[in-house]
């Protein structure tokens, strides 16, 4: 069952919801789902301070407590409706309420009834402690139901056994206990029977009076019967879950219980009889030693009886170990057994233990006595037989040695193969690492070479740029000077220089002609031509003053003047023609000399 059937959340109105269910122990019929409870939902009648009982579904209980030996039909903890403390069982809740809330008379909802599958979910009571005492008190009386109690009392067998002393281990929860009056009668002797608990009898009478008659008592009996049926079903399920054992065992934790229920006795001779040791005279037998791991006494022994006290008894005891086989054989004399356990019925049973062993005797119908006596010498026997070394034949030893050798060879070959595999893996990994290192080194070298070439190219480019800049810087002043010269000398200057040169040449020619005429016509002034030739006209001085530099043909004109005179004297025709030219040049010079010099 994974849903809360027939239950709806009073906040979100979700019906048949999954998960945890929280029931308010103050408000009547008020339930919340896990989400609404965690959100702290409140209403006009419900507050956050109200105690809530958490109820789980059967599937959730199996999920949470599946590996534990707990009942699956009841919640594992209850909440106090007065102080909101959690984690109580039904018994501890009763003790808590009786100790701390005796004077509280608030009407609350019973959390035990609300948590039980077949209980009343909305049972409101103002005497919560009394309700727990009458309805949910399950103490030492839980081993006998209310339906079986009157018949047990009538037959004189009203026995209530303590749960901690029953067979099958200590009690974990009350639902794990199932019982019957017949088992109680067969387990205990008449001297160990207990009388009816007077407090329980008084409470049962008060419950009948409080409920007001037989119908209420019958209802209580029906409820107890239903609860008993549920407990029996739960116990049967848990027994089915337990592992099957091949032989019955007796736990050492329950050693005080009656061993007659487990050990079945048989009739013997005059000395005594029992399931453990049997014989005539003193009684001899053997049993298995206690298992040191589980502290249990397995009754698995093979017995051999002897007719006299001097007969020898041999028992084969098998003990399980982890990886070895132990075959234990023991023999004892003088009518002794290993543990000296003998059971007598209606008489006296004596058990003589071996060397250093103890004797145990129990009786169901009468009294039993047992004693342990020491053997001849402590060194001749062993206290713990299971630690005796087994004896093997040569063939068995050979088989054992061969198996050991096979195992050692197998382990050796396995280790060698593993080491070889690891070595191969390491070599392969080293080779791959070496290859990768070589590849990385080659790539790194290529990168370095490329970087070096790039740096060299950049250096060459930088040097070329520097040289070009230097050349440009050197050529720039020359170009500037050339430009300045070109700016200073224009075409007009060349025209002016040529004009000046022509004028000066014409003046020179005129002056040379005038001097010749004066020398030829007047004898009174023989040096007139020379003087005329030696003086510069005013026009020449003006032109020379304007130009600021001598004409390039001045020296040539001065040198040509005596040559012209010689030619004129040597060739009269040429001199006449030259005279005409000089005259024309003189008239032209006279025209030019008429310009006044304003400077």
From Swiss-Prot:
One of its GO terms (cellular component) is synapse. A zinc finger (C2H2-type) spans 78-101. Residues 155-193, 229-253, 269-294, 466-486, 507-599 are annotated as: Disordered. Residues 269-285, 513-532 have a biased composition (Gly residues). GO terms for biological process: negative regulation of ERK1 and ERK2 cascade; positive regulation of proteasomal ubiquitin-dependent protein catabolic process; synaptic signaling. It catalyses: S-ubiquitinyl-[E2 ubiquitin-conjugating enzyme]-L-cysteine + [acceptor protein]-L-lysine = [E2 ubiquitin-conjugating enzyme]-L-cysteine + N(6)-ubiquitinyl-[acceptor protein]-L-lysine. InterPro entries: Di19_Zn-bd, KCMF1/Dystrophin, Znf_ZZ, Znf_ZZ_sf. The keyword Cytoplasm does not apply. Gene3D superfamilies: 3.30.60.90. Coiled coil: none annotated. Residues 160-170, 180-192, 559-593 have a biased composition (Low complexity). Zn(2+) 2 binds at residues 24, 27, 46, 50. Keywords: Metal-binding, Transferase, Ubl conjugation pathway, Zinc, Zinc-finger. Its EC number is 2.3.2.27. It is an enzyme of class 2 (transferase). SMART domains: ZnF_ZZ. A zinc finger (ZZ-type) spans 4-60. Residues 538-547 have a biased composition (Basic and acidic residues). GO terms for molecular function: ubiquitin protein ligase activity; zinc ion binding. Interacts with poe. Has intrinsic E3 ubiquitin ligase activity and promotes ubiquitination. Involved in the negative regulation of the Ras/MAPK signaling pathway in the wing by acting with the E2 enzyme Unc6 and the putative E3 ligases poe and Ufd4 to mediate the ubiquitination and proteasomal degradation of rl/MAPK. Belongs to the KCMF1 family. This is E3 ubiquitin-protein ligase Kcmf1. It comes from Drosophila melanogaster. The gene is Kcmf1.
């Amino acid at each position: 069952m994974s849903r809360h059937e027939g239950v709806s959340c009073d906040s979100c109105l979700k019906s048949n919801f999954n998960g945890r269910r929280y029931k308010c122990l103050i408000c009547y019929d008020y339930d919340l789902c896990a989400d609404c409870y965690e959100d702290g939902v409140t209403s006009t009648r419900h507050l956050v301070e109200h105690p809530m009982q958490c109820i789980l579904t059967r599937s959730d209980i199996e999920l949470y407590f599946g590996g534990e030996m707990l009942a699956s039909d009841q919640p594992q903890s209850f909440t106090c409706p007065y102080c909101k403390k959690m984690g109580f069982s039904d018994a501890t809740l009763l003790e808590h309420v009786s100790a701390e809330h005796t004077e509280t008379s608030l009407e609350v909802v019973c959390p035990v009834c609300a948590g039980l599958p077949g209980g009343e979910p909305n049972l409101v009571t103002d005497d919560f402690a009394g309700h727990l005492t009458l309805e949910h008190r399950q103490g030492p009386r839980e081993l006998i139901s209310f339906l079986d109690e009157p018949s047990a009392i009538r037959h004189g067998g009203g026995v209530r056994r303590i749960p901690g002393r029953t067979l099958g281990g200590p009690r974990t929860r009350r639902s794990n206990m199932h019982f019957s009056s017949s088992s109680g009668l067969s387990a205990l002797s008449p001297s160990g029977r207990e009388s009816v608990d007077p407090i329980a009898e008084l409470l049962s009478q008060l419950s009948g009076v409080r409920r007001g008659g037989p119908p209420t008592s019958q209802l209580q009996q029906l409820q107890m019967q239903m609860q008993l049926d549920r407990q029996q079903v739960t116990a049967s399920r848990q027994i089915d879950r337990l592992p099957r054992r091949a032989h019955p065992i007796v736990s050492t934790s329950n050693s005080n219980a009656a061993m007659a229920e487990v050990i079945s006795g048989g009739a013997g001779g005059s000395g005594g009889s029992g399931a453990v040791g049997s014989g005539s005279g003193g009684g001899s037998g053997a049993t298995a030693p206690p298992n040191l791991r589980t502290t249990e006494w397995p009754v698995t022994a093979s017995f051999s009886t002897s007719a006299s006290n001097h007969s020898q008894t041999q028992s084969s005891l098998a003990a399980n170990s982890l990886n070895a086989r132990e075959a234990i054989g023991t023999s004892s004399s003088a009518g002794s057994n290993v543990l000296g356990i003998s059971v007598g019925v209606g008489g006296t049973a004596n058990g003589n233990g071996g060397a250093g062993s103890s004797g145990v005797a129990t009786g169901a119908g009468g009294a039993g006595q047992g004693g342990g006596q020491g053997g001849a010498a402590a060194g001749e026997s062993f206290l713990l037989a299971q630690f005796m070394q087994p004896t093997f034949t040569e063939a068995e030893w050979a088989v054992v040695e061969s198996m050991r050798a096979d195992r050692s060879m197998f382990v050796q070959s396995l280790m060698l193969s593993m080491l070889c595999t690891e070595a191969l893996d390491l070599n392969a990994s080293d080779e791959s690492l070496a290859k990768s290192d070589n590849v990385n080194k080659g790539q790194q070298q290529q990168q370095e070479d490329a970087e070096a070439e790039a740096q060299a190219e950049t250096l060459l480019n930088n040097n070329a740029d520097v040289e070009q800049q230097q050349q440009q810087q050197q050529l720039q002043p020359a170009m500037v000077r050339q430009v300045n010269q070109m700016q200073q000398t224009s075409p007009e200057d060349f025209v002016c220089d040529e004009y000046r040169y022509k004028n000066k040449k014409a003046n020179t020619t005129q002056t040379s002609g005038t001097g010749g005429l004066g020398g030829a016509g007047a004898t009174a002034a023989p040096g007139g031509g020379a003087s005329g030739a030696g003086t510069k006209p005013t026009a020449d001085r003006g032109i020379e003053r304007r130009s600021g530099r001598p004409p390039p043909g001045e020296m040539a004109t001065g040198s040509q003047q005596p040559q012209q005179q010689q030619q004129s004297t040597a060739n009269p025709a040429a001199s006449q023609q030259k005279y005409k030219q000089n005259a024309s040049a003189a008239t032209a010079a006279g025209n030019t000399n008429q310009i006044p010099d304003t400077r």
